[in-house]
C-alpha cells in the first residue's frame, strides 16, 4: 500500500510531553525564539527533529528503522520569564545517536544544521546533561586537579600565572628572558599567548628551547617546580603533535592548546597524548565569544566547558568575575563547579539546568585571566578558592620595576590573602586592609599597589545571595 507521503507537522512525531527521560539520555535545554506564528510546541519539536532523525518530509526509508527508538524528543517547554515569545525547550536524545568518545560527533548532531533552521528566529543551547553512560566513553582531562598538585608539589593555595606580553613581536631569546624573570620572581607558570604559534619573528622550536632553559634555571634557583604553557596549536594535527612531542623531549611539565580554533578532534588527540606522556594540558578558549556571547543565539559557555572536560584539558580559561555584576558571578561559579566537581545539583539561579554527575572523570582547574591586578587578589581568592590559576599578564609585566618584582608582588599578595583566610579573616570585608598590611614589608607589592590604586576595587560581601 506504500506509505503516507507528504509534509506533516513535526509536533505530531517529535513533541512528546508524556515522555519519561531515561538515565542514559543526553538532555539539552534550548532557548528557542520561534518565527511569528510558529507555536512553541512546533518549534521545540522541530529542534528535536532536525538535531536527530527528522527531515522536512516523510521518507520511505523511515519504514526501515524504528523512529521511536532513535528520535530526539521535545519533552517539556517553558516560557522564559521577562521575554516575549521565547521558550526553553527540553530535548532528550537516545544515547545510540552518538559515537562514543567523540565531542565532535555530539556537537555535529546537537548544534549542527538545526541552528540555521528557518522556522526559528534564534536558537541557543543553554545546557547539556551528559549521562555517565556517555561520559564514561571519554578519557577526559589528562591528569586532573589532584594529580596536578602532586606533580607540582603545591597545595593549599591558588596557582599563579602570567601571559608573556607583548604577545607578538618578541624574539625567542627575549621571550625566554621574560619567562625566567617571572618564574624566578615567584610565579608558578608563565603562558604563551593564544595567538603565539610559529611566526616569522619567533619560530616554535626556538621558543620552546629558550623557555625550557628559563624553566630549569628558575627551578634551580627557587627550589620550586615551574612551568610555561608551550602553545602546541598548529595548522595541522600532525604539526601540533610534533610540537607536543618536542615539549615532552625537553622534559617540561605542561603544554597548551586553543581548543575551539584547533577543534575538538585535535584537542582530544592531544589530551590523550598528554596523559600517555605525563604532560599537563592548558586550554585557552579563543573564539568562545563568537559562539557564546549572544544571549539569544549560539551556545552558552557552560556547554563548551562541559565539552572540554570530556575532550580533555587540565586548565581552562573561565573569566574573572571581578568587577562584573552579581548575577554573572553566580553563573560563572556555576560552570566553575561543572568543571571542578564530581556532582553538581541542578540550580537555575546559577544557570545549571540539569543535575550533572561526572562520576570519576577528573576535574579541570579554572583560570581567571584578563585585566586583574594585586588589588583583586582577595576577591579572586575568595571567589575561586584554592583550585584555580590566577593569571596576571599586565598585572605582572606592568610593574614599574620590571617583571621579577611584578611576580614578587603577586606572590606576596596571594600568600597574604591565603594566610588571612586561613586565620579566619573575611576577605570580602578586609581585602584592601590585608593587601595594605602586606605591602608594608614588601616594597615590590607597595609599588604595585601604588600603580593600580586608581582602579576600583569593589567587592560586595558574598552573603547577599
Curated annotation (Swiss-Prot):
Keywords: Calvin cycle, Carbon dioxide fixation, Chloroplast, Disulfide bond, Lyase, Magnesium, Metal-binding, Methylation, Monooxygenase, Oxidoreductase, Photorespiration, Photosynthesis, Plastid. Substrate binds at residues 113, 163, 167, 285, 317, 369. Its cofactor is Mg(2+). Mg(2+) binds at residues 191, 193-194. One of its GO terms (cellular component) is chloroplast. The active site is at residues 165, 284. The keyword Disulfide bond applies. Binds 1 Mg(2+) ion per subunit. The disulfide bond which can form in the large chain dimeric partners within the hexadecamer appears to be associated with oxidative stress and protein turnover. CDD domains: RuBisCO_large_I. GO terms for molecular function: magnesium ion binding; monooxygenase activity; ribulose-bisphosphate carboxylase activity. The record marks 324 as: Transition state stabilizer. It comes from the Eukaryota. RuBisCO catalyzes two reactions: the carboxylation of D-ribulose 1,5-bisphosphate, the primary event in carbon dioxide fixation, as well as the oxidative fragmentation of the pentose substrate in the photorespiration process. Both reactions occur simultaneously and in competition at the same active site. The basic functional RuBisCO is composed of a large chain homodimer in a 'head-to-tail' conformation. In form I RuBisCO this homodimer is arranged in a barrel-like tetramer with the small subunits forming a tetrameric 'cap' on each end of the 'barrel'. HAMAP family: RuBisCO_L_type1 (MF_01338). Belongs to the RuBisCO large chain family. Type I subfamily. This is Ribulose bisphosphate carboxylase large chain. It comes from Byrsonima crassifolia (Cajuil cimarron). The gene is rbcL.
